[in-house]
């Protein structure tokens, strides 16, 4: 098995990438670095769920740096500009994951962000490719989005905590607005 450092945003989004990467001959080590997740209780809840799942699955977990001040200074000011905000957020988190991968002697690096249909897939991959190359790492980029329904099913079956927004306060507002819009559309369709 080839060791791979896999940045993880949460336990549910890790399920299918870990399974599929193992089938390809990789042995993922999970790397948690998510200073974007707010509020602090939400950050703790997601990390605790990931810790539990990794322990149950005998998966190594590295808890890396959490530079919240840097996130607030470099990402938060982009606020409502989702494409720029997400690109900056991916860059901050994946730069830390690549730093850890290089320091720990990994050749391969990837991210579970590629499982969610709500992420900016191409942007995330562009950022990962650039940062991995700068550190002499090989990015492992896979489109896990077709497996999102299975990840959802499995996470519910396992009783995992499932969040309903990406992590930052801006995504929480955007997700709430999307849910309200969908609810309104369903009500209108029933009339």
Name each model feature, range by range.
Residues 1-191:
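Nucleotide-activated chemistry modules centered on ATP-dependent adenylation/adenylyltransferase
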């Amino acid at each position: 098995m080839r060791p791979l450092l896999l940045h993880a945003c949460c336990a549910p989004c890790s399920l299918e990438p870990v399974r599929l990467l193992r089938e390809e001959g990789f042995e993922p080590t999970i790397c948690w670095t998510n200073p974007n997740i707010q509020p602090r209780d939400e950050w703790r809840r997601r990390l605790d769920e990931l810790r539990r799942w990794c322990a149950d699955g005998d998966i190594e977990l590295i808890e890396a740096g959490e530079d919240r001040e840097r996130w607030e200074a470099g990402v938060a000011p982009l606020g409502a500009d989702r494409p720029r905000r997400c690109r900056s957020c991916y860059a901050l988190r994946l730069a830390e994951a690549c730093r850890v991968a290089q320091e720990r002697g990994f050749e391969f690096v990837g991210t579970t962000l590629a499982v969610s249909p709500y992420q900016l897939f191409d942007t995330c991959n562009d950022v990962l490719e650039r940062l991995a190359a700068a550190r002499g790492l090989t990015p492992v980029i896979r489109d896990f989005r077709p497996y999102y329904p299975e990840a959802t099913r499995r996470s519910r079956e396992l009783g995992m905590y499932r969040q309903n927004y990406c992590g930052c306060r801006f995504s929480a507002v955007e997700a709430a607005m999307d849910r309200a819009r969908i609810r309104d559309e369903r009500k209108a369709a029933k009339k």
